């Protein structure tokens, strides 16, 4: 089970909509880096029944089923997700509804923003730490990336860049 005295990461490793879901292998690698840096943190994957659950379990398998991941803990309703979000230390993953709930509960979050989403529009700017990475953070203004398709834009967001920025975010706000 979960020890509420220890830090908890809620990880949005998948999403309902494919176009809002970062590459699984990159997600698995990034969370593995997190586990190496913060082995004391307990991790809960946030997923809905059906396809999201299948995706979450596949990522868990790709990671080698680390003991830090409590794969069977799942919020079965929005109300349960709110209760869970009140207990976590931070959120990481795909930008989406779960991140909004976490933010409303006053918890910090770092997200990967889908190419179809405007980071400045969706990430709140208030006293709760919230940051993320979008393909537009990687490209320079002179590059012609608007013509790229969604997958090519997502490919610009490397696992190393996500880990470096997320790690800096954790340190900057003294989250762990």
Language-model region placement:
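Nucleotide-sugar donor-binding and catalytic loop/hinge architecture
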Residues: 1-9
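Glycine/threonine-rich flexible loop motifs
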Residues: 19-23
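Donor-binding and catalytic core of enzymes assembling or modifying cell-surface/extracellular glycoconjugates
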Residues: 24-115
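A short, flexible beta-alpha/helix-coil linker loop
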Residues: 14-18
């Amino acid at each position: 089970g979960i020890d509420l005295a220890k830090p908890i990461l809620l990880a949005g490793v998948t999403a309902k909509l494919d176009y809002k879901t970062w590459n699984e292998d990159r997600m698995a690698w990034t969370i593995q880096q997190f586990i190496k840096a913060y082995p004391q943190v307990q991790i809960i994957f946030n997923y809905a029944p059906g396809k999201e659950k299948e995706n979450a379990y596949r990522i868990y398998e790709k990671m080698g089923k680390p003991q830090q991941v409590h794969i069977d803990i799942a919020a079965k309703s929005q109300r349960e997700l709110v209760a869970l979000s009140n207990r976590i230390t931070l959120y990481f993953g795909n930008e989406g509804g779960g991140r909004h709930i976490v933010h409303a509960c006053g918890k910090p979050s770092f997200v990967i923003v889908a190419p179809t989403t405007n980071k400045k529009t969706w990430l709140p700017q208030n006293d709760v730490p919230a940051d993320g990475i979008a393909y537009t953070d990687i490209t320079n203004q002179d590059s012609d990336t608007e013509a790229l398709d969604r997958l090519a834009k997502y490919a610009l967001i490397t696992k190393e860049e996500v880990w470096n920025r997320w790690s800096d975010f954790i340190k900057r706000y003294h989250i762990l």
